[in-house]
Amino acid sequence: MGKLLQLALHPDELASIVQFKLFRKNENARNPATESAELIRCYELLNLTSRSFAAVIEELHPELRNVIMVFYLVLRALDTVEVDMSIENSVKLPVLRQFHEKLDTKDWTFDGNSPNEKDRCVLVEFDRILGQYHELKPQYQKVIKEITEKMGNGMADYIENENFNSNGLLTIEDYDLYCYYVAGLVGDGLTQLIVLAKFGNSELSVNKQLFKSMGLFLQKTNIIRDYEEDQVDGRAFWPKEIWGKYANELSDFMKPENQSQGLWCISELVCNALDHVIDVLQYLALVEEQTSFNFCAIPQVMAIATLELVFQNPQVLTQHVKIRKGTTVSLILESRTLEGCARIFRRYLRKIHHKSHPSDPNYLRLGITIGKIEQFLDGMYPHYVPKGITPQTTSIRTQVVKRLQLDEPMKRDIDEEILKTRILLLSLGVAVFGVVYGVVRII
């Protein structure tokens, strides 16, 4: 009933769901009939651990589909060891630090997780993942192994860091480093894979700040959103350098009398996350294969929509919040072109700016940050260019023009999907009206 009410209140999202389910094209669908039993099982494990990631991964170009599936499962297995508090550190730390070495084997498994650990299956059946890992091209294996080594050691370092375990993250520098180990390293690996497949401009792997920002923007958004959940679990990821300006203890924001200070703290955290947006837009402009672009773009547009949701939202301090399913579908459909992504970012940035209030200590900083991003977006897609004037040639504008070759076919597909959706909904509307009219006449 709740979902039906949401659709009734947001009819545009109903159209998006119809378009997504019935008319969206997928030219890279898997064909399980041609796959080995081991490969099929790996995709089953992928769906068991994350249905949302599985859906996007399964639509990737065949060159990278299995590569990124294996990469995700390897890192999920690593994470499943790290988060399981039932595993003694004497066991956990060596496994984390040596996990990359297990990739050289073909039959290693691990059954030391708690029976209640929901993702333990990826470790119990890790030999199947290893089988598919060894089917990959050597250059892809090398990337996966390198990132696994860095992430495993990073996880172990944080477990052994008594200051972090006692006090959480203290400085913004600590915050950035933690987010890099959790998400920036993933961005590093994915970027290397995309460039190796020749699906992205080589600048992606040269300018490391771009892929770092991709990961940090996502992770910081999740950390802001998950405040209440982390507090309940006894975890602290908001940096004290920020929250210490507004409270004596991080948990104070859960008290009703501290709501205003909590919202101001969220405001500063949002400002900090928005500092990565220009890098994110530059990164997306350099991805030159459609399915890889979709894979990179979808999480980023979800992140900016989530930042708008958490901004000035007191519910973040007392409960878990998330964007509506219909909104998610709309964002997936709109983000299939670079111009669509730019439009989404502009829309949500303006919503954030509109919700900001002069009483917020971060009001001026927020306005300046959003203004810089809007100026960058104008450089990508100038709103108004007087007749006879040629837009200024910049590196981002040059890349945008180059990407038009990729975006134009997708724009045509999107227009076709929208037309079919409207025809279907109009036909259904006419049919329903006819039935109602007939019933009324009989009565």
UniProtKB/Swiss-Prot annotation:
Protein's cellular compartments: Endoplasmic reticulum membrane
Gene3D superfamilies reported in the protein's UniProt record: Farnesyl Diphosphate Synthase
Membrane topology: Multi-pass membrane protein
GO terms of molecular function: squalene synthase [NAD(P)H] activity
A Gene Ontology term for the protein's cellular component: endoplasmic reticulum membrane
UniProt xrefs under InterPro entries: Isoprenoid_synthase_dom_sf (IPR008949), Squ/phyt_synthse (IPR002060), Squal_synth-like (IPR006449), Squalene/phytoene_synthase_CS (IPR019845), Trans_IPPS_euk-type (IPR044844), Trans_IPPS_HH (IPR033904)
CDD domains tied to this protein: Trans_IPPS_HH
Gene Ontology terms: biological process: ergosterol biosynthetic process; farnesyl diphosphate metabolic process; isoprenoid biosynthetic process
Pathway listed: Terpene metabolism; lanosterol biosynthesis; lanosterol from farnesyl diphosphate: step 1/3
Recorded superkingdom: Eukaryota
Protein's name in the database: Squalene synthase
Organism: Cyberlindnera jadinii (Torula yeast)
Organism lineage string: Eukaryota, Fungi, Dikarya, Ascomycota, Saccharomycotina
Gene that specifies this protein: ERG9
